[in-house]
């Protein structure tokens, strides 16, 4: 499991909103943002370069961010939505969702693997099928991503959703119990097994014939 790394960024409060104000902010190197949740909404702006740097660091919906809001101090949030201009690669607007301790939220958690599956060394094909899951949990138990060790997976083995080791507060929102990772037999391995089985059958037939 990967604990949540806290990213920090300063927010300048704004009392004026609207298209003209947003354009003015962007021309000055700022990006308009909204902070929602906890019954209070705050409009603000953040430095575009600092925001892009944070976004390109690989933040997810489950990444904890600490906003230093002008006049309000530190507030822990998650990214709810990032809007970009379709014609240019620039962030247009960001909505942050304020963390309320003990109040469950729904977010997406990435699944990563570590190690080399044992079966992949003996002719098996390793497959990572599910890379992300939706989870309902309290903010205190959120992880940026879930890491599973696949070292002991042999040919024919798999890891299902129900086998994941997760915090007890997690409710994984998925239908059934699908396979997350597996090691399957390759065509070459299946062909080798068929050839071996055919050879064994031929040997058995010869042995029986010799006894007559």
Swiss-Prot record:
GO terms for cellular component: cytosolic large ribosomal subunit. InterPro entries: Rbsml_bL25/Gln-tRNA_synth_N, Ribosomal_bL25/Gln-tRNA_synth, Ribosomal_bL25_b-dom, Ribosomal_bL25_C, Ribosomal_bL25_long, Ribosomal_L25_dom, Ribosomal_uL5_bac-type. One of its GO terms (biological process) is translation. Disulfide bonds: none annotated. It holds the Pfam family Ribosomal_TL5_C. Keywords: Ribonucleoprotein, Ribosomal protein, RNA-binding, rRNA-binding. GO terms for molecular function: 5S rRNA binding; structural constituent of ribosome. Belongs to the bacterial ribosomal protein bL25 family. CTC subfamily. Part of the 50S ribosomal subunit; part of the 5S rRNA/L5/L18/L25 subcomplex. Contacts the 5S rRNA. Binds to the 5S rRNA independently of L5 and L18. This is one of the proteins that binds to the 5S RNA in the ribosome where it forms part of the central protuberance. PANTHER family: RIBOSOMAL PROTEIN L25/GLN-TRNA SYNTHETASE, ANTI-CODON-BINDING DOMAIN-CONTAINING PROTEIN, RIBOSOMAL PROTEIN L25_GLN-TRNA SYNTHETASE, ANTI-CODON-BINDING DOMAIN-CONTAINING PROTEIN. This is Large ribosomal subunit protein bL25. It comes from Leptospira interrogans serogroup Icterohaemorrhagiae serovar Lai (strain 56601). The gene is rplY.
